[in-house]
Amino acid sequence: MEVILIKPVRKLGKIGDILKVADGFGRNYLLPQKLAIRATKSNKELIVKQKYEFEEKDKQVREEVEKINTIIKDQQLVFIRQTSDDCKLFGSVTNKDIADKLSKNISYNISHSNIILDKQIKSTGIYTVEIRLHAELTSIVTVVVARSESEAQDYLREQKAETLEDVDETA
């Protein structure tokens, strides 16, 4: 299937690119998410005319996302959860939990699909989580999972001490 991208897609292309993609990928992801349109003759002519508009709209979105990104990058999200004796959670901290808490903290709606978890969070500790609000822009947020507020503060102190040690070693 041949498609024309109308939004930048990470690892695929930028606005206006004409690509051949698998039929299923095009039908089930790119077209429903309004990331691309079918590459018909009329759409190719239309995209040439509207490419500038799409790029301007993307530029505005990117500027807004950069402002949000400056707020997000300093966030430390603390989750207090019940655990077993060996610090395993009863359940897990999901990307939806992280999105909800982050949205509440910064007063901006963040979708759970923007949260990129390397693996499920199923035990206490400090985790770094990637937030992707734009195809070309990512943020890193610190997530602390603990049994109590005091334990969470201990984790944060340990991390700060380790960071200071790393700085001393490199100096």
Curated annotation (Swiss-Prot):
GO molecular function: rRNA binding; structural constituent of ribosome
Entry's Gene Ontology BP terms: translation
InterPro entries noted in UniProt: Ribosomal_bL9, Ribosomal_bL9/RNase_H1_N, Ribosomal_bL9_bac/chp, Ribosomal_bL9_C, Ribosomal_bL9_C_sf, Ribosomal_bL9_N, Ribosomal_bL9_N_sf
Keyword Ribonucleoprotein part of the UniProt annotation: yes
Gene3D superfamilies: Ribosomal protein L9, C-terminal domain, Ribosomal protein L9, N-terminal domain
Keyword match RNA-binding: yes
Function text: Binds to the 23S rRNA.
Matches recorded under NCBIfam families: L9 (TIGR00158)
Family, as annotated: Belongs to the bacterial ribosomal protein bL9 family.
HAMAP family: Ribosomal_bL9 (MF_00503)
Protein name: Large ribosomal subunit protein bL9
Species per Swiss-Prot/TrEMBL record: Rickettsia prowazekii (strain Madrid E)
Lineage: Bacteria, Pseudomonadati, Pseudomonadota, Alphaproteobacteria, Rickettsiales
